[in-house]
């Protein structure tokens, strides 16, 4: 028994100390794990802190950009987004957008902002605007935000400079210059306006914006590319441009369901049609030039062509868009303004009925001499485009640091010349929101951009289609006021986002005059 007790005592003596040792080991292991966890937490906290500091520094640098001089006042908004959301906010009036108006009131006529990720100086100052246009190619160059470049193509005429831009401008003037207007386009526009108005008068009503857009598109697309809507390969071209236009000036979010995505899809499909037409033309034997596309194909076939296929396609796309959309919008808002101002319609009828009375054949078309005699009509057109403000901004980019009006515009920054801010300035135009064509009475015809009138641009890039646009508007007004009366059926409300649109259309009914 004794040995057993001794053995038991020995076992007890050797086993009892094991428990504290195991406890200590577990404690050490737990402490190590806790320490490792704490270290990981501290590391994570430091990383988060570093990220926050980096983010704050980035945000500070965004809102306080480096400059070699005094920047214009204003805010660049949130990083990357900037003030893009405010810029695209809808405005249901003809007045200056709240985005520009509020900032002019707060900062003055020159201020900085950020739109679609780029710092931009906005100018509502006539002197600065004129200076920017006059210094193109020296201190500034034509520029549009990346999203606009994606829409119109990276090789579109607005993105080209120097010799290539001048060459393309000369090419376009073959079609839209005064000689071709006198000899060909005046008669064709007059016939198109007569035919369309007669067709609309036979219908219960017409959605005017869509009707005018189709009329001008059919006319100009035929002159540009020999457009034939009866051909299966071309039947959807007008529809594709319609989709493109719906999202043209919208928030640049390219995901399905957004207006911008619809715009990009419209461009892609329109370019597919144009590319197919180009391949067909290139495969055909050489022929005399019948339309503008033939001139382009002729250039592409040269041994050392100045054009590339990409530049040619982007050029055709931009010309098709510019040829019909802006004029269609101006004419639509013009008819709306005439509807609201019957005294102006009476004065127009007086001028145009006098023209008809002086004709040998009352049913003959408008001649060039008659067109040039439409003095009051010219005043009406000037007033329409002043109030329409189809183009909310004209963009340029500083090629170097530019000192102007006590401010420094850093190299690489964008400049947005704001025509509406000038056209609606009460210090320049008395009662600027009033439709008053007589304000232009006795003033010389404007043939280029001025400090106080930029509806057709300014400087070297004054719109080459200005004369065609004026001819279209004048011949349309001539047939409208001499052959018809009309009434509004529904719609007519406008929205600027910031581009002009008629969200519920503008439906009118035409009544032929006896």
From Swiss-Prot:
Q: Which InterPro entries match?
A: Cyt_P450, Cyt_P450_CS, Cyt_P450_E_grp-I, Cyt_P450_sf
Q: What is its EC number?
A: 1.14.-.-
Keywords on this record? Cytoplasmic vesicle, Heme, Iron, Membrane, Metal-binding, Monooxygenase, Oxidoreductase, Transmembrane, Transmembrane helix
Q: Which GO terms describe its cellular component?
A: cytoplasmic vesicle membrane
Its induction, per UniProt?
A: Transiently induced by auxin and light in dark-grown coleoptiles.
Additional free-text comment from the UniProt record: Not induced by auxin in the Yin-Yang mutant, characterized by an elevated growth response of the coleoptile to auxin.
Q: What is this protein called?
A: Cytochrome P450 87A3
């Amino acid at each position: 028994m004794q040995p057993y007790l001794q053995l038991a005592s020995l076992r007890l003596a050797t086993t009892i100390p094991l428990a504290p040792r195991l406890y200590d080991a577990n404690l050490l292991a737990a402490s190590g794990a806790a320490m490792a966890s704490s270290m990981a937490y501290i590391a994570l906290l430091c990383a988060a802190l570093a990220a926050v500091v980096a983010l704050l520094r980035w945000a500070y640098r965004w809102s306080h950009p480096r400059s070699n001089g005094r920047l214009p006042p204003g805010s660049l908004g949130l990083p990357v987004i900037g003030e893009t959301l405010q810029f695209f906010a809808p405005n249901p009036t003809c007045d200056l957008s709240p985005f520009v108006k509020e900032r002019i009131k707060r900062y003055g006529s020159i201020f900085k902002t950020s739109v679609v990720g780029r710092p931009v100086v906005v100018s509502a100052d006539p002197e600065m605007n004129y200076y920017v246009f006059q210094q193109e190619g020296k201190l500034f160059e034509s520029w549009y935000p990346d999203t606009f470049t994606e829409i119109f193509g990276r090789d579109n005429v607005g993105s080209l400079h120097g010799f290539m831009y001048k060459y393309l401008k000369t090419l376009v003037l073959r079609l839209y210059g005064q000689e071709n207007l006198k000899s060909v386009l005046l008669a064709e526009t007059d016939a198109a306006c007569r035919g369309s108005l007669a067709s609309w008068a036979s219908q219960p009503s017409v959605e005017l914006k869509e009707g005018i857009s189709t009329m001008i598109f059919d006319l100009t697309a035929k002159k540009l590319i020999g457009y034939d809507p009866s051909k299966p390969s071309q039947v959807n071209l007008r529809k594709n441009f319609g989709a493109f236009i719906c999202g043209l000036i919208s928030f640049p979010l390219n995901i399905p369901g957004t207006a911008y995505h619809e715009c990009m899809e419209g461009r892609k499909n329109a370019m597919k049609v144009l590319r197919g037409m180009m391949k067909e033309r290139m495969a055909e034997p050489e022929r005399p030039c019948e339309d503008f596309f033939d001139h382009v194909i002729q250039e592409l076939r040269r041994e050392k062509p100045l054009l590339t296929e990409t530049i040619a396609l982007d050029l055709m796309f931009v010309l098709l868009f510019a040829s019909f959309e802006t004029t269609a919008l101006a004419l639509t808002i013009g008819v709306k303004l005439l509807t609201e101002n019957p005294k102006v319609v009476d004065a127009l009828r007086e001028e145009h009925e006098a023209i008809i009375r002086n004709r040998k054949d009352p049913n003959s078309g408008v001649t060039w001499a008659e067109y040039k005699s439409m003095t009051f009509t010219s005043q009406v057109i000037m007033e329409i485009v002043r109030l329409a403000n189809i183009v909310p901004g004209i963009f340029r980019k500083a090629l170097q640091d530019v000192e102007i009006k006590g401010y420094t515009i850093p190299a690489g920054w964008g400049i947005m010349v704001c025509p509406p801010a000038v056209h609606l300035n009460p210090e320049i135009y008395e009662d600027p929101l009033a439709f008053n064509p007589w304000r232009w009475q006795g003033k010389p015809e404007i043939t280029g951009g001025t400090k106080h009138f930029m509806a057709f641009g300014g400087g070297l890039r004054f719109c080459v289609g200005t004369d065609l646009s004026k001819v279209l508007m004048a011949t349309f007004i001539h047939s409208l006021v001499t052959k018809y009366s009309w009434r509004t059926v529904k719609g007519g409300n406008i929205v600027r986002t910031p581009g002009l649109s008629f969200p519920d259309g503008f439906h009118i009914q035409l009544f032929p005059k006896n």
